[in-house]
UniProtKB/Swiss-Prot annotation:
Species of provenance: Petromyzon marinus (Sea lamprey)
TM regions (residue ranges): 6-26, 32-52, 84-100, 113-133, 136-156, 241-261, 272-292, 301-320, 325-347, 370-390, 409-429, 456-476, 478-498, 576-596
Subcellular localization: Mitochondrion inner membrane
Name of protein: NADH-ubiquinone oxidoreductase chain 5
Function: Core subunit of the mitochondrial membrane respiratory chain NADH dehydrogenase (Complex I) that is believed to belong to the minimal assembly required for catalysis. Complex I functions in the transfer of electrons from NADH to the respiratory chain. The immediate electron acceptor for the enzyme is believed to be ubiquinone.
GO molecular function: NADH dehydrogenase (ubiquinone) activity
GO biological process, one term: electron transport coupled proton transport
Alphabetical UniProt keywords: Electron transport, Membrane, Mitochondrion, Mitochondrion inner membrane, NAD, Respiratory chain, Translocase, Transmembrane, Transmembrane helix, Transport, Ubiquinone
Length: 598
């Protein structure tokens, strides 16, 4: 077929994917079933551009009439339909379809479900806008859109104080990242006179500029909850479980990593920024893995595993392998969404209980849920031939064959080991053993649970093989390496299994890991200590500086001190006059009498 027609079909399919999603947003009260069906239809439509790309290796850019057209600067509505867009869009749509179907059961008793589904749909559309943007303005619109929608969805249960605090916390931390992105946009506008991504990468890819690259790294740190700006991610678990599934799998938290992948040409020839990205990712992945190992809340364990995997993606970007980071982002979306839906099924059936120490033997009552949770955890561990294995193994191989940073290598290997440890602990505590809950606890699995979990389970099983076999690597791969490097992932898996068995051994007196259960006291230091110190300093400033200076120097005491010397002088003179006047009068009287007597 003529390439012109293929380009037309590809562009039309990409636009139709978005257009199909618009009716539920325009309608005042769309039904949940209609919204879910339209997302399903949109997912199948999005396969058309993907099929054309896989067959013809074709990428297009759809540009429309400029919004602003100045002498040296213009902004046009432009969509970049490349491999990142055509691959990630069907994945995001499929996951959203599964989450919406699951929500029809999970949140059946909630009011305003039409608004909830609108929020989910807007969340998805803003993410698609972000990944398909071909200029920084559209990218910023999608970037802010996912931030706003995450705030609305995390605070969905607005009657709960913790939900509102968590939503505000997410916004506050993301504001820091937004400052970095805006700083880079201003620099681009003033130095390149363009916000078009293709022009920017063409002009700056061979040079090193600190301000724009640092701004993009700060933006990714805030949005993807990297170390330093990470406390909002576990706090976001106060929202509904379907929100957590969408937030952690294919929307907001991966937006920061995707930003670095999209703008990687600016980083690829800048060793300093690559080193910073590598060390930041390594620090994030080890801290999150240590916290996940000591948590007992099922949703927080999965949330910290998300943070750890995001750190692993940042490591891949820092190794100058954005292609591998994108592959891991795609495979991670499937099993992370499935793990959250499994946790939602367990929580709902266990009467809103989230402590894994109170779960056990759930494989008898919730067989499909525990099976899918086992598959998702195994894929997260990197068990051979599951989705996570193909991408995790590539990251470890790239890290082992790199001469960049030995500390990052050691820390990342420790984090990968701990990933298997907390995933195995989650499976053992939930699925095996004797029941630790009431025998009359009602548990059931219906089609609203089964169908989404089955779809995501298939994605967790085969997505890694399909993606790595159909997408060629961007750089030449190393085909010869020592056996110990090739098998290091398997060795880490075995070691971590031993660690997890040790952690779940009930015969050993368990000690409280207060340091990591409290997230290394980082939220207390940042949220409590800093505010407490600022209040103390403010109090001292007002009471010991302002009040004292007013009272002692300017106010009543100051006036009294200033008037003390004159009043003392006058008083002394008054006392002097009081003592001398009678003597003078007596002397004058004597003189007068003496003169009279003569």
């Amino acid at each position: 077929m003529n390439s012109h027609y293929l380009t037309l079909i590809m562009n039309s399919g990409a636009l139709l994917t978005i257009i199909v999603l618009l009716p539920p947003i325009i309608m005042p009260k769309p039904s949940m079933i209609l919204t879910t069906k339209l997302v399903k239809i949109s997912m199948f439509i999005s396969l058309i551009p993907l099929t054309i790309y896989l067959n013809e290796n074709m990428e297009t850019t759809l540009t429309m009439k400029p919004w602003m057209d100045w002498a040296l600067f213009n902004i046009a509505l432009s969509f970049k339909i490349d491999k990142y867009t055509v691959i990630f869009t069907p994945i995001a749509l499929m996951i959203t379809w599964s989450i919406m179907e699951f929500s029809q059961w999970y949140m059946a008793k909630e009011r305003h479900m039409d608004k909830f589904f609108k929020y989910l749909l807007l969340f998805l559309i803003t993410m698609i806008t972000f990944i398909s943007a071909n200029n920084l303005l559209q990218l910023f619109i999608g970037w802010e859109g996912v931030g706003i929608m995450s705030f609305l969805l995390i605070s969905w249960w607005s009657g709960r104080t913790k939900a509102n605090i968590s939503a505000l916390q997410a916004v506050a931390y993301n504001r820091i990242g937004d400052i970095g992105l805006m700083m880079s946009m201003v620099w681009m506008c003033s130095n390149t006179n363009s916000w078009d991504l293709q022009q920017i990468t063409m002009l700056l890819s061979d040079q090193q500029y600190l301000i724009p690259t640092l701004g993009f790294l700060i933006a990714a740190t805030g949005k993807s909850a990297q170390f330093g700006l990470h406390p909002w991610l576990p706090a976001a678990m106060e929202g509904p479980t379907p929100v957590s599934a969408l937030l952690h799998s294919s929307t907001m938290v991966v937006a920061g990593v995707f930003l670095l992948i999209r703008l990687h040409p600016l980083f690829q020839n800048y060793p300093l920024m690559l080193e910073m990205t590598l060390c930041l990712g390594a620090m994030t992945t080890i801290c999150a893995a240590l916290c996940a190992t000591t948590q007992n809340d099922i949703k927080k364990i999965i949330a910290f595993s998300t943070s750890s995997q995001l750190g692993l993606m940042m490591v891949a970007v820092g190794l100058n392998h954005p292609h591998i980071a994108f592959l891991h982002m795609c495979t991670h979306a499937f099993f992370k969404a499935m793990l959250f839906l499994c946790s939602g099924s367990i929580i709902h059936n266990m009467n809103n209980e989230q402590d894994i120490r109170k779960f056990s033997c759930l494989n008898n009552n919730l067989p499909l849920t525990t099976t899918c949770m086992t598959i998702g955890s195994a894929a997260l561990m990197g068990l051979p031939f599951l989705a996570g294995f193909f991408t995790k193994d590539l990251i470890l191989e790239a890290l082992n064959t790199s001469y960049t940073n030995a500390w990052a290598l050691m820390v990342t290997l420790m984090a990968v080991t701990l990933t298997t440890a907390y995933s195995s602990r989650l499976i053992i505590m939930s699925a095996s053993g004797t029941p630790r809950y009431l025998p009359l606890t009602p548990t059931h699995e219906n089609n609203f649970i089964k169908n989404p979990l089955k779809r995501l389970a298939w994605g967790s099983l085969i997505s890694g093989l399909i993606l790595t076999s159909t997408l060629p690597p961007m750089k030449p791969q190393i085909f010869t390496m020592p056996t110990y490097i090739k098998t290091i992932a398997l060795m880490m898996f075995i070691i971590s299994l031993i660690i997890s068995m040790e952690l779940t051994n009930k015969k050993i007196n368990q000690t409280t890991f207060s340091f990591f259960t409290q997230l290394a006291f980082y939220p207390h230091i940042i949220h409590r200590l800093t505010s407490h110190l600022s209040l103390i300093w403010s109090q001292k400033l007002m009471t010991q500086v302002m009040d004292v200076s007013w009272l002692e120097k300017i106010g009543p005491k100051g006036l009294a001190n200033h008037q003390l010397k004159p009043s003392t002088t006058l008083t002394e003179a008054h006392h002097l006059n009081s003592a001398t006047l009678p003597l003078m009068a007596f002397a004058l009287t004597l003189i007068t009498l003496s003169l009279t007597a003569r």
